């Protein structure tokens, strides 16, 4: 049995042409692989309140997938949830069709027959940890969340779920870049894979490799599925080049297999951009920084340029709106100061 695994489609109709390019890329993957079933691990939509065009495009994707697969499973991602209430309310429920084997996973669901656990996104990480703790031995987990040590697509938010909580092979959406960790005990060799998006979604992801996965397993036996990661070589992508490198990379930039967002970094020399040689969907022009890090002063004074003394602290405490007395607050301040 072959299962195609893909995640974080982020269907977006706000950029003209992008939604069609996304749908075309996703359907090309399914049509090329012809899997027995598909699993979409969340963030189908870019925005919590998808537009009619985005809803209809996902219906088109599912209708095409159903022609060649026996079942499709779709997890609720954070972008698919109406609010952050963890109540499971999502527009994805519109696509539930058990007669044609489309199952929407709003809350944690265990498939005992296929030995799988599906965990959608929850804002409360304790809910996710509790679900991971209940995973039966040798079951495969599919989820939409991160783990301690990996960051979101903006690179500014870590997650608090330790890898030690992952005791079974796990595939995750939510993280846009491909990465793999080891869960459970050191000698368990439990794979925890963040699959990443099948295409880039912003310039911060420029030049990243995008993947989907194909799992091949025996329905009757209990052996772990065989995993094959496949690189996507079409669809939306973001590229960033300094203007001096445009001419040398025209073949890459103009590759017709991609719907390309090109950012051109312009320096102080204001060299002309060869627009007539570019065949891309969008061009974004941005000025490069005037100074690099080496040109910025690294001055670090040895003495305090400003300090807060006892008088300032005392005046601040006396003005504080607190039921504690000034003497009591100052006593606490001195204890903290002595502790330092």
Model regions and ranges:
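Conserved catalytic scaffold of divalent metal-dependent phosphoesterases
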Residues: 58, 76, 80-163, 191, ...
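Accessory, non-catalytic peripheral segments of nucleic-acid enzymes
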Residues: 216-340
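Short, conserved loop/helix-junction motifs that constitute active-site signature segments
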Residues: 65-68, 132-136, 160-167, 185-188, ...
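Conserved beta-sheet core of the metallophosphoesterase superfamily
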Residues: 151-225, 230
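Structural motif
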Residues: 3-6, 39, 118, 140-144, ...
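Divalent metal-coordination and catalytic microenvironments
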Residues: 8, 38, 43, 58, ...
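N-terminal active-site segment of His-dependent metallophosphoesterases
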Residues: 1-63, 67-68, 130-138, 339-340
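Active-site environment of divalent metal-dependent phosphoester hydrolases
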Residues: 10-14, 46-49, 73-86, 123-126, ...
